[in-house]
Amino acid sequence: MKLWLNGAIATCRFELQRSFTFQRTSVSLMLALFPPTMLFLLSLGTRVSGDLTGFQDFAKLISVLLISLVCLLSQLLWATPNVYSELEGKSWGFIASRPGARISILLGKFLASFVVSFAISLLALSLCVIIADRMLGILNPEKFWIAMSGVYLFACLAYSAIFSLIGTLFIKRAMVVGAGYIIGSEMVLASIPDVLINQFTVRFHLQELGIRWAGWFFPSPSSLKDYRLVFGEGLPIALHIGLLFLIAAVALGLAGWIIVSREFITTEES
């Protein structure tokens, strides 16, 4: 266990150092700046028209949606190539021959993708809250920032584990499968009202945490009652958090079992 942890920390440190190259830093900044840029343009247009009625809540909603999109995109870029990048770099043979190296690589890349995606999400959230507060005067910006920071913390944790699992299962098509997972599970299944299956999705638990912690941030105040009629009252907050940890642990456990027991092809067949 100590060998795995030391190797994971070393791998995470190495991956984070690689993230500060010009290309990767540019991609990270583009992702982080996309939500606040869109919110700024929408807020500017609203201020010009002079109609701020109801837009404060809409600003929170559009911020949550855009930052969630950026969070998922960053996971696709950093978590899914965990095995393929080593195969492509011709380093898998060395990794496979070292004791505990496979698990260390998996955990290290998981930690790196978690840190990078959370940093991107947190920067985007901070800029969105500043813009919404200065230009629109939203209520309780500090509470909204703290609440959504917690939500994105758990989002990055769970999605990093899931996309790490996808990366070990589908080597060359991990990003495609990851995008399919987002559409099929987090958009379709999570939207099925008041059934047990949507509670197996990450979005359901994150959505409940966001509503409980940040308050109802949709434009229509009466829509909270309609939401509860459709999706039910939800679970206790501690249970939502516990299930998110369980999802991450199960995904990482399966990924660890696969990466240890599976034989990966390191050379192209002629």
Model-flagged regions — what are they?
Residues 2-4, 262-270:
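Short, charged juxtamembrane terminal tails flanking transmembrane helices
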Residues 2-13, 83-85, 89, 160-193:
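Cytoplasmic juxtamembrane interface segments
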Residues 42-58, 169, 174, 179-265:
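Terminal transmembrane helical anchor/hairpin motif
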Residues 94-101:
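Short helix-to-coil transition segments within interhelical loops
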Residues 1-29:
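Aromatic- and glycine-rich beta-strand/loop motifs that create alpha-glucan
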Residues 36-85, 106-174, 236-237:
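Secretory targeting signals
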Residues 26, 103, 173-176:
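Residues that define the loop-to-transmembrane-helix transition and helix capping
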